Amino acid sequence: MENGEKAAETVVVGNYVEMEKDGKALDIKSKLSDMFWHGGSAYDAWFSCASNQVAQVLLTLPYSFSQLGMLSGILFQLFYGILGSWTAYLISILYVEYRTRKEREKVNFRNHVIQWFEVLDGLLGKHWRNVGLAFNCTFLLFGSVIQLIACASNIYYINDNLDKRTWTYIFGACCATTVFIPSFHNYRIWSFLGLLMTTYTAWYLTIASILHGQVEGVKHSGPSKLVLYFTGATNILYTFGGHAVTVEIMHAMWKPQKFKSIYLFATLYVLTLTLPSASAVYWAFGDLLLNHSNAFALLPKNLYRDFAVVLMLIHQFITFGFACTPLYFVWEKLIGMHECRSMCKRAAARLPVVIPIWFLAIIFPFFGPINSTVGSLLVSFTVYIIPALAHIFTFRSSAARENAVEQPPRFLGRWTGAFTINAFIVVWVFIVGFGFGGWASMINFVHQIDTFGLFTKCYQCPPPVMVSPPPISHPHFNHTHGL
């Protein structure tokens, strides 16, 4: 077994070559560039996973707690954190299996980024590829939309002179600059800074809520309605389903086989941010959060809050790049530009991908409810059901299990234990996440459309203050003047 793993490691060490280097082998002349730009270590992968996972959901989790109640909110975070870590592990196993098989066949991945749909194609055939491609691309499309909506929602709490739709136009143009980032190999400094930013924001939410104290007459009535309960649960499912970019992150690593437990450790860190912040904000504001899906809306405006807003804006730009970069790769492959040596040509070719994202963010600016809808309809399949089923079908034969590059952990019961966990995930997520969650999220989403309408200029903005006109002055007549 050890010899097999060493052989696999030798094969999978990889031939990753930077695409922005005009096809030349990676030759880093500048130590500064090496430090900030070229990342491929296990630490880089950990920062990427943790930074990408927590994103803007940090601001909507208190809203989910108001729908679920404190106890259910905490339990669902722990539960979906475990499930998400397991399916990320499955994706990493399938990637290593696929890449090992291909490199044993002397396939060269120079200037080519392996993606999830290609793993499914190589292991299970074109039908799996098509299903995986459809779900993955749709999820990443709406994941990018959510980041754009979050940018507009957050900046409004600093500058409300412009409505949220106008801010969406502005940040759509800003986020389009991510077309110049070649791959996940180049997110080293951004991932590091992104995690620092969300760490500050999480602890700001926690400390500010505790110092603020409970509002007068605070109520914690959740869970009050079944629809709200499953809507909140699917937002948490979405929170820990951020591993749709796992394959791309792994491919950027120098030793992808080291990824196996990285997502688990990233999740453990993320829980130290999400549990205290969501609990503290819900404790302080209670049911008020039901009508304020962004936690910033209820906290007093001061320098600390404004700083947190700015940091989250920068982080959402980074997360937009995380979600959109795999879409850039798919589009490049579709139009035959993926292996182009000119980064400028590839950047120009990527721009059409941003246009539908921009448009959808303007149509559906429902910050909060859209997370649950995407979670139930897309995340449930993309990062939970499909990876679990793919693992079962890839290793369904005894020969495939015997020749597998990576064996399941012994403490989980090897193949029997792994398949049992996979089956449980498929059934649970399909019934609870997609079934009940989809029903609840769609009802809530339609309610937002009925209440605010499509293309709404300023979702959940306070009504404008009506300034009363000055009193009309009447001329004073001296009735005794003519007497």
UniProtKB/Swiss-Prot annotation:
One of its GO terms (molecular function) is symporter activity. Disulfide bonds: none annotated. The keyword Glycoprotein applies. Pfam families: Aa_trans (PF01490). Residues 1-53, 95-130, 188-190, 248-261, 328-350, 396-422 are cytoplasmic. PANTHER family: OS05G0424000 PROTEIN-RELATED. Belongs to the amino acid/polyamine transporter 2 family. Amino acid/auxin permease (AAAP) (TC 2.A.18.1) subfamily. This is Auxin transporter-like protein 2. It comes from Arabidopsis thaliana (Mouse-ear cress).
